[in-house]
Amino acid sequence: MRTARLLAPATLLAASLALSARAADEGFTPLFTADGPPKGWVVTEWNDLAKPAAKGVTWSVKDGVLTPGKLRGTWLVSEKEYTDFVLEFEIKLTERGNSGVALRTPMKGDPAFDGMELQVADFRYNTQAKDSELTGGIYRAIAPTKQVYKPTEWNTVRIELKGDRLKATINGELVQDVDLTKFDQPVKRHDGTDAPPVKDRPKKGHIGFQHLSRNNEPIQIKNARVKELK
């Protein structure tokens, strides 16, 4: 009887932890569950989402890992639009790898300047990069608070957008917690012209993943999921 009484609290604790884990997962939708090209997503040119990628260029999932096609310079963009959401995923780059996450982007123009792009890049991709062009930065607009990127390893990313508030963690470390309305200065595009200030960027749009690694070095993404917020 004493053994039974001792086991009961442990059993209850295990059940409680299991319930907590399920509750934490509630509302999340996995993004890439089936092998092959992801359904509900389109592949476009990297600098203008209105331009489809070259014929035959695809992104594909195998054994739960998403990888881009062989052509450098593409985005994989959701057909669905999102307003307020939490996006979680793991990403692994090689040396000189360059990726990014499109947030609330329209289906035209460059997500880095016409929507928002959270940069994910190996520091060797551009050794002259400004802070806002490093991993965790909102590209050319908002520098991350710290660098916690792990080169050539899996990195865990969590992005939360609700209204004008953006929070982002990488490997469990908070790198962004900002009020987007505070960023009222134009941002320079790659051609030197002005892009809208972050405060004026869309409040609703698509999400996406970028492949811009040098020498077409691969990127890998897994365990991607999204939860829409009310």
Predicted features and spans:
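Positively charged n-region of N-terminal signal peptides that target proteins for export
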Residues: 1-6
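Carbohydrate-interacting regions of secretory-pathway proteins
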Residues: 21-230
